[in-house]
């Protein structure tokens, strides 16, 4: 056969020209949680993307309405299960808002420190997973080792490494351990050093940068229209952080910056998370300095807080108080409220309705990554198939939170 001296067009080659459908998920290794993405392709270019969520729906809201207010804490742990302490604190603040109570100052600092430790864990695992999905496995191991340091602190304080169920209406389950501050100071220094080491491995890697820079971009207007909050919104240049815009607990006493990006691409989302790790470290250091060494953790109200165990076993009054709170629940005044905090993925909101009984009448959650996931199809349309994984990873979609 004589060699051709010209290029053949598609008609001569008789190649199929219709688009191809490709399923990614719901059980794909790169799908954080269980998500199905149906891609319409021309070659390897994505023409359309249909993102289907809901595979991890567990009826969270209805489960919360079956028990007492205190029995909700194990459920909220399993929303964003990468940073469960932030969920605990968010729900506790919502119920306390309905009760009209404020926890002691020492408890507020304790909540801030534990919450910021959880935020750092959340950001580290998201950044590490993105790195691993792009072929950089070593930084992921560095960041997992860093998370292990904080998990040991959580285990010492709460008894659990991941799902703590440590929050309580009116306070926390227990006061800080004697060496809590020392553990956090030492652990924070080690973690920040590991974060710096992990960054050195990838931030000058040309392959890593090319896969993130300019990929998965979104404008400020589109991000706001989709209801985005958190890192993904700040990466577009909008400096909205609930801790700064509407300070709760003692966040108004801390000096910290709100990292923002400029283009809203994968690289900006990655770098915003890395800088937020350092800002969370600043908050923790200030909170450790300001936190009182003595004082109550829980409010002094027998209608809300369980009595000490030694009193339950020795006095009839404490036994009755314990029995009524456990069996009947805390009597929250009839009404409704919306309370929101800055969780790992953005604004985590709880809309609560009480009929005056010890059981929630209605619990509605505003999960931040539910709104974020709605924008995924817009982000990946026009990209290549390999770009789906790092773009999806940069959004940090957590199945338990999104599907609840």
Curated annotation (Swiss-Prot):
HAMAP family: NDH1_NuoD. Disulfide bonds: none annotated. One of its GO terms (cellular component) is plasma membrane. The keyword Chloroplast does not apply. The keyword Nucleus does not apply. Keywords: Cell inner membrane, Cell membrane, Membrane, NAD, Quinone, Translocase, Transport, Ubiquinone. This is NADH-quinone oxidoreductase subunit D 1. It catalyses: a quinone + NADH + 5 H(+)(in) = a quinol + NAD(+) + 4 H(+)(out). NDH-1 is composed of 14 different subunits. Subunits NuoB, C, D, E, F, and G constitute the peripheral sector of the complex. Belongs to the complex I 49 kDa subunit family. GO terms for molecular function: NAD binding; NADH:ubiquinone reductase (non-electrogenic) activity; quinone binding. It is found in: Cell inner membrane. NDH-1 shuttles electrons from NADH, via FMN and iron-sulfur (Fe-S) centers, to quinones in the respiratory chain. The immediate electron acceptor for the enzyme in this species is believed to be ubiquinone. Couples the redox reaction to proton translocation (for every two electrons transferred, four hydrogen ions are translocated across the cytoplasmic membrane), and thus conserves the redox energy in a proton gradient. It comes from the Bacteria. Pfam families: Complex1_49kDa. InterPro entries: NADH_Q_OxRdtase_suD, NDH1_su_D/H, NiFe-Hase_large. It is a peripheral membrane protein. Its EC number is 7.1.1.-.
């Amino acid at each position: 056969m004589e060699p051709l001296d010209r290029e053949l067009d598609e008609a001569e080659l008789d190649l199929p020209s219709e688009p191809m459908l490709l399923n990614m998920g719901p059980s794909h290794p790169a799908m954080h949680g269980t998500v199905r993405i149906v891609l319409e392709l021309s070659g390897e270019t994505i023409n359309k993307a249909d993102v289907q969520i809901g595979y991890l729906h567990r009826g969270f809201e209805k489960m919360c309405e079956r028990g007492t207010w205190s029995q909700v804490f194990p459920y909220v742990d399993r929303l964003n299960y990468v940073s469960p302490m932030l969920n605990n604190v968010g729900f506790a603040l919502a119920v306390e808002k309905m009760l009209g109570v404020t926890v002691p100052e020492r408890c507020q600092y304790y909540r801030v420190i534990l919450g910021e430790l959880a935020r750092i864990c959340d950001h580290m695992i998201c950044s590490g997973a993105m790195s691993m999905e792009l072929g950089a496995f070593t930084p992921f191991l560095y960041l997992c080792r860093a998370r292990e340091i904080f998990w040991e602190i959580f285990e010492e304080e709460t008894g659990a490494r991941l799902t703590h169920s440590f929050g309580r209406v009116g306070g926390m389950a227990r006061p800080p351990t004697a060496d809590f501050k020392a553990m956090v100071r030492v652990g924070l220094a080690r973690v920040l050093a590991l974060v710096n080491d992990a960054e050195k491995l990838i931030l000058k890697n040309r392959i890593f940068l090319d896969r993130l820079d300019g990929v998965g971009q979104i404008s400020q207007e589109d991000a706001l229209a989709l209801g985005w909050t958190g890192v993904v919104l700040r990466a577009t240049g909008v400096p909205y952080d609930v801790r700064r815009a509407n300070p709760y607990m003692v966040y108004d006493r801390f000096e910290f910056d709100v990292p923002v990006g400029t283009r809203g691409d994968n690289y900006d989302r990655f770098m915003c998370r890395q800088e937020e790790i350092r800002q969370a470290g600043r908050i923790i250091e200030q909170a450790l300095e300001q936190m009182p060494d003595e004082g109550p953790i829980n409010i002094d109200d027998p209608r809300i807080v369980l009595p000490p165990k030694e009193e339950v076993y020795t006095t009839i009054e404490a036994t009755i108080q314990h029995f009524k709170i456990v069996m009947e629940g805390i009597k929250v005044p009839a009404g409704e409220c919306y309370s929101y905090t800055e969780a790992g993925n953005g604004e985590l909101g709880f809309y609560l309705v009480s009929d005056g009984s010890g059981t929630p009448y209605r619990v509605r959650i505003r999960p931040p990554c539910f709104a974020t996931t709605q924008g995924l199809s817009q982000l990946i349309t026009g990209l290549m198939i390999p770009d789906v994984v790092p773009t999806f990873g940069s959004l940090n979609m957590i199945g338990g939170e999104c599907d609840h």
